[in-house]
Amino acid sequence: MSEHSFVWDAVQRVRTGAPLVHNITNYVVMNTTANALLAAGASPVMAHAREEVEELAGLCSSLVLNIGTLSKPWIESMFAAGRIAQSRGVPVVLDPVGAGASSLRTWTSLDLLRELNISVLRGNASEILALSGAGSRTKGVDSIHQAADAADAARELAGKFGCVVVVSGAEDLITDGSSDVLVRGGHDMMPRITGMGCTATALVAAHAAVAGSVLDGAAAGMGVMAVAGTMASRKAKGPGSFQMHFIDALYGMQSFDVEAGVEIVR
């Protein structure tokens, strides 16, 4: 099996299986995230009300906990949905948006990691460093570090919490603490578009729901993200059209696009 085969296999599994991805995510990205999941072949539900999250978590194939627009009721919903999802053995993916920027974001992320069985932690380098206790701060929700800067912190967090950690950047690092995968691809226009990291988290959740292992699912999700970015860059004239072409790329992606659009290093 080539290093690209597991990515294409996961793409096909998402398209045929249409996994239900329950997103407790932020107001900024709800529409973009839902459209990306639909284009990839998954089935999104965007629900955060405490009164229904347990019921929906009982149906989902994976759960996204994204702290981008955090508030106390949403924190309660995240814990409630997370407990149901973990009891069913479905992947729970945490996006610690802006961890390090405020105490609320940092401590909520750490509490979720401590109290739930998080399957995948996906963040930028500054967020991962902040959660590791390295003392990093973010520029708002943006990273001021490269993925390689957080490699040791990612492995430490993976070992401490028994999860896969994804550090996104120009080169993505995916690690379970003992095995690493590097994903290279995409385009430097991607950081100019709000919510691309949140889209990556949702794609990781969709592919983790169907892959043979959480590590492969996370790597496949980031690989798909990179391929779609590479494809979109060929047609886009700026961030606005890039986002449109990115969604189209998720929908139309073929095996030869995967072969040409991303480099996977194990």
Swiss-Prot record:
Substrate binds at M46, G195. Coiled coil: none annotated. It is an enzyme of class 2 (transferase). It catalyses: 5-(2-hydroxyethyl)-4-methylthiazole + ATP = 4-methyl-5-(2-phosphooxyethyl)-thiazole + ADP + H(+). Pfam families: HK. Its EC number is 2.7.1.50. Keywords: ATP-binding, Kinase, Magnesium, Metal-binding, Nucleotide-binding, Thiamine biosynthesis, Transferase. One of its GO terms (biological process) is thiamine biosynthetic process. Belongs to the Thz kinase family. This is Hydroxyethylthiazole kinase. It comes from Oleidesulfovibrio alaskensis (strain ATCC BAA-1058 / DSM 17464 / G20) (Desulfovibrio alaskensis). The lineage of its organism: Bacteria, Pseudomonadati, Thermodesulfobacteriota, Desulfovibrionia, Desulfovibrionales. The gene is thiM.
